[in-house]
């Protein structure tokens, strides 16, 4: 379920404070965050945010189309290696 409109979008206060400070100083540094649940706001456009995927921080460059989505949507937590392949041993067992 989505968040109630009267509450507004959620963004981690620490992350928002860092973004506002960087916008005032005209800086463009990579910001590390563990807050995958934060909604991408218009103030974040143009910044690179390193989102934690459970193993490492994945750099995500924020564009206009991403506004309204969550940071976690752009840092996948699972890597699919593919299904098992036929080997010489498995075909010999048949």
From Swiss-Prot:
Keyword annotations: Ribonucleoprotein, Ribosomal protein, RNA-binding, rRNA-binding
Gene Ontology molecular functions: rRNA binding; structural constituent of ribosome
Purpose of the protein: Protein S19 forms a complex with S13 that binds strongly to the 16S ribosomal RNA.
An annotated GO BP: ribosomal small subunit assembly
Similarity comment text for this entry: Belongs to the universal ribosomal protein uS19 family.
GO cellular component: cytoplasm; small ribosomal subunit
Organism: Caldicellulosiruptor bescii (strain ATCC BAA-1888 / DSM 6725 / KCTC 15123 / Z-1320)
Official protein name in the record: Small ribosomal subunit protein uS19
Coiled coil stretches, renumbered: none
